[in-house]
Structures are given as C-alpha cells and as structure tokens.
Amino acid sequence: LILLLVFTLTIITSVGLSNFKLDASSDALVLESDESLKTYREAEDEFGDSSFLIVTYEPKNELFSEYSLKKISQLENDLKNIDGVDSVLSILDAPIFFQPRVGLSEVSDNLKNLTDPEVDLNLAKEEIINNPIYKELIISNDGKTTAMQVVLKGNKEYSQLINSRYEILEKLDSREPLTSKTINQLQNDLENINTRISEINNQESEFNKLLIAEIRQTLDIYRDEATIYLGGPSMIATDMMEYIESDLVIFGT
C-alpha cells in the first residue's frame, strides 16, 4: 500500500514538473510594491540599464605591448558583434590625458588612447596605473590585468510594462475614490501586464542562456593568449538557473 502511494505521488509530481518554470528576474524575488526596487528602476531609466558583464584579461605577454593590445582589440570587436551585446568598453577606450605632454589648457583637444601611434606605451602604463579613475577598475595595481565591460541590450517593452504596472499600483493604492468598474478594469489590466512580463522574463532567460554561452565560446578562442574570467549579474543568474534546472531533472527522475 505504501509503495502504491509513493508511486502515485511520483506520477502526479512528474506530470506537474513539466509545467514548472523558473523565473530568475527581480520580479520573482521582491514584492510588486517594493520601494527599493522602484527607486532602482527609476535610476535605470535616468542613467541607463545596468545589465552588463565583466571580462578580466591577463595576457601572458606584457599587457602594454602592441601584441597584447591588438588581441584585446580583436576580442572587443568579436564581443561587439554578438547578438544581444550593446557595447563593449575596454582599456583601449580609456583616454590618455598627458600623452604627448601638453599644458592643462590643451588636454581636451589632445585626448588620445592606447591605439594612437603617438602614445608611448611605457609612459601610458604609468599614467593609467596611477590614475585614480582607472586604478582597480580597468587596471589592476600591478598593471598586469585589465577589465572589459560588456553592456547588454535592454528590452524597451519590458521597461514600458514595468512603468505601466507601477502606475496601476499607485492608482489602486491611492486614496482617490474609485468606482468598482474602474477597480476591476485596473486589476484586469494589472493581470494582463503581469502575464506579459512573465512571458518576457521566460524569453529573456532563454536568450541570456544562449548569449552567455556564445560569449564564453568567444572568450575560449583567446584563452591560449591570456587568463580570462567572466562575471556579472546576468551570468550569475543564468548559471544559478541552470544548476537548479539540473537538480530538478535529477531529483525529478
């Protein structure tokens, strides 16, 4: 009897497991009315989306050499060409302020970067390492490791839906008297918006999985030349979901 009961429960669980979906978005982790999340999203609207990855690159050769900088340039271009990547910022994009040596009044008209043939790489190395703007952000203290920021494309529809949801929630929470018809309409709109947001989250989750995989494949091409690591919120969320999905498959069989 006990074995029959266990078998029945296993069958029921297995049927429901196929419909189980994981949501790694912030919506699944906080309440709809969370003020901190709202403030965070308002900052994103003002200053831009914060979806990005960080690539650290430590070449086997001298970082500030023409060969290493050429490899970084190639990697940067390869990453830019990946669908889903909006832009890439690297040490090559960092302006060199005092190469060649000019007066402070002329600095703005003479900004160059490491790709400029007039720049002395040895002097540029010292300037970048000792620049508080760059230090421990795009360059390590010892000048051997640099970082690249891979900015991911946002989803305009998602942002619009989030804003619409906040507007509805504010109306429902306001002290302004609302008719039953208006309340029902707002609640219906809210339900439709939440459904669409969930759909987008699922689509984005699958897309990010493929995106992270393609970025890793691109980085693998350069691993013979350097020690490379990938990090960032999107990668962590994607990897966590894959670990959980793997556990569900194992424990669900």
At which residue positions do the language-model features occur?
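Extracytoplasmic
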Residues: 41, 45, 115-253
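A common structural microfeature
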Residues: 2, 17, 50-54, 85, ...
